[in-house]
């Protein structure tokens, strides 16, 4: 496998890249991650089964688009490829540490707000379906935000759970609840990172960086809400964000709806206590 990866990387770089060092990196529940080195240039490699190729291809598409915005800093994609049994993505390697200092947290908040201001899009969705972790994320374009989120985010995850034999609520009834709660909220579509928890953000010598996106055009509050779901972001991050784009009234109610999507995805991926958390959140939303 590594010989094939080395050869494909050499073909891309137009010079022979001979791997002399390979270090397994911690983190990541889905793919194996490595740092490779030829003595001069290091790269970051994610590896999975061959069937994972499409997931790496759409991840690369999101990273390319985020780099195009010149707002938040993301790794550069070097190569997406496959071997006989595996698929892989190669990114430029940058040493990182936790993003936990006030100055850089404030800066990242500003950069995220600038991302949310970037571009013009009249509908919600994305040109391709992509993945939230290893879960397919449908992105069919829709003009109404309440319809898009209720059906392609909440309804989709609930249906996946139902196919696994888990029913937390009547799906059609709850989709209607979400539509009604979001009906009077008409945000402008913003390009989202889509999976913005603290494990996908770090600090490099060049400033804050984020990775593992699940991009789509949606309500910017979805990114902010997820930063609060699992915590780990400094107060200065939110101050930096709101110095560019203040949050709108009603955000704290909508936050529960938006984060339910990620809780349900964790139910589908991991089960366990996330099922109880999802049920409690559903009950809370119904009570609004």
Swiss-Prot record:
Record's keyword terms, sorted: ATP-binding, Kinase, Nucleotide-binding, Transferase
EC number: 2.7.1.-
Pfam families in the cross-refs: Fructosamin_kin
Domain of life: Bacteria
Record bears the keyword Transferase: yes
This protein's record includes keyword ATP-binding: yes
Cited InterPro entries: Fructo-/Ketosamine-3-kinase, Kinase-like_dom_sf
Entries under Gene3D superfamilies matching the protein: 3.90.1200.10, Phosphorylase Kinase, domain 1 (3.30.200.20)
Active site location: 195 (proton acceptor)
GO molecular function, one term: ATP binding
Binding of ATP, residues: 92-94
Task of the protein: Ketoamine kinase that phosphorylates ketoamines on the third carbon of the sugar moiety to generate ketoamine 3-phosphate.
Family per similarity comment: Belongs to the fructosamine kinase family.
Protein name per UniProt: Probable ketoamine kinase VP1481
Provenance organism: Vibrio parahaemolyticus serotype O3:K6 (strain RIMD 2210633)
């Amino acid at each position: 496998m590594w010989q094939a990866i080395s050869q494909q990387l050499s073909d891309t770089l137009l010079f022979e890249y001979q791997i002399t060092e390979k270090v397994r990196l911690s983190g990541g529940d889905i793919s194996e991650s490595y740092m490779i080195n030829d003595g001069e240039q290091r790269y970051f490699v994610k590896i999975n089964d061959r069937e994972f190729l499409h997931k790496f291809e759409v991840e690369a598409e999101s990273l390319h688009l985020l780099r195009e915005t010149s707002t938040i800093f993301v790794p550069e994609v070097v190569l997406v490829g496959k071997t006989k049994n595996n698929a892989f993505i190669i990114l430029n390697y940058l040493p990182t540490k936790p993003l936990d200092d006030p100055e850089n947290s404030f800066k990242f908040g500003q950069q995220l707000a600038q991302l949310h201001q970037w571009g013009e899009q009249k509908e919600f969705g994305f040109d391709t379906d992509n993945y939230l972790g290893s879960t397919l994320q449908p992105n069919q374009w829709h003009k109404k935000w309440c319809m898009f989120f209720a059906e392609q985010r909440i309804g989709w995850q609930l249906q996946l759970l139902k196919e696994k034999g888990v029913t937390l609520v009547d799906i059609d009834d709850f989709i209607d609840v979400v539509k009604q709660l979001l009906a009077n909220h008409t945000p402008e579509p913003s390009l989202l990172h889509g999976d913005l928890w603290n494990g996908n953000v770090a600090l490099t010598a060049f400033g804050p960086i984020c990775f593992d996106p699940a991009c789509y055009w949606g309500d910017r509050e979805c990114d902010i809400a997820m930063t609060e779901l699992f915590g780990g972001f400094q107060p200065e991050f939110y101050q930096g964000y709101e110095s560019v784009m203040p949050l709108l009234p009603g955000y704290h109610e909508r936050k529960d709806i938006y984060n339910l999507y990620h809780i349900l995805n964790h139910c589908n991926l991991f089960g366990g206590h996330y099922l109880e958390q999802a049920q409690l959140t559903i009950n809370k939303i119904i009570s609004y």
